[in-house]
Amino acid sequence: MDYINAALLGVIEGITEFLPISSTGHLIIAEQWLGHRSDMFNIVIQAGAILAVTIIYWRRLLDLVLGWREPANRDYAAKLIVAFLITAVLGLVVKKVLHFELPETATPIAWALIIGGFWMIFAEWAAARKAPHKEITWLVAILVGIAQIVAGIFPGTSRSGATIFVAMLAGTGNRAAATEFAFLVGIPTMYAASGYELLKTFKDGGAANEDWTALGIAFVVSTIVAFIAVKWLLAYIRSNRFTLFAVYRIILGVLLLGMAATGLIG
């Protein structure tokens, strides 16, 4: 993999990992033109995005750890842990028992983008008719944990999109509160998933022939771009709905279906 392709994939990962437009879907599509990427490369660029959001939320995370004696912090942290554990257990079942593999064609991704776009529009409509509560309930925590697995099974769904809008529909009508919980749950989830895949890759000898310069470039680019993207998103949702992302998903999904039908992509 050349360095320009590595940087481009880092940009794609950085932009799409935490925006509700599906990073996995975009990367699978990008692979059609930029070439196949190794498991190690996937792990590295995702690690960059995770690091970015960890830096953004480091004060909040530190507050939860140091302020665990406070009931509100303890309750919030417990819900994060429950959501993470649900994802971890279901993830192992999907991986080890069901032997799930990501699709390599664009058509299922296109449909997931389209369906997810309409789902986002509905979620915004439904949430607007509820009081904008900031509270994260136990129901929200459980459903967010499940939503992370659903997003992992269906690339194009978007982990952030699925978790944010499940939280909004389940009672957390405040966009900022739903987004924060979704991102905070994503931090341990993605670190655990990346760590698991990294150990597996080293064990299988998959890291032996990697271009570490390309990996380093992709990691740095992914971190910087993800930091900018998340900062922008958090500012954007203070006064805007997610409708822009929903429309983008639907348009992209339709375009991909057309390209797949005409043989432009696989």
Curated annotation (Swiss-Prot):
GO cellular component: plasma membrane
One of the GO BP terms on file: peptidoglycan biosynthetic process
Principal location class: membrane
GO molecular function, one term: undecaprenyl-diphosphatase activity
Catalytic activity: di-trans,octa-cis-undecaprenyl diphosphate + H2O = di-trans,octa-cis-undecaprenyl phosphate + phosphate + H(+)
NCBIfam families for the chain: PRK00281.1-4
Cited function: Catalyzes the dephosphorylation of undecaprenyl diphosphate (UPP). Confers resistance to bacitracin.
Extra remark beyond the main annotation: Bacitracin is thought to be involved in the inhibition of peptidoglycan synthesis by sequestering undecaprenyl diphosphate, thereby reducing the pool of lipid carrier available.
Recorded family membership: Belongs to the UppP family.
Protein name, entry field: Undecaprenyl-diphosphatase
Species this protein is from: Rhizobium leguminosarum bv. trifolii (strain WSM2304)
Taxonomic placement: Bacteria, Pseudomonadati, Pseudomonadota, Alphaproteobacteria, Hyphomicrobiales
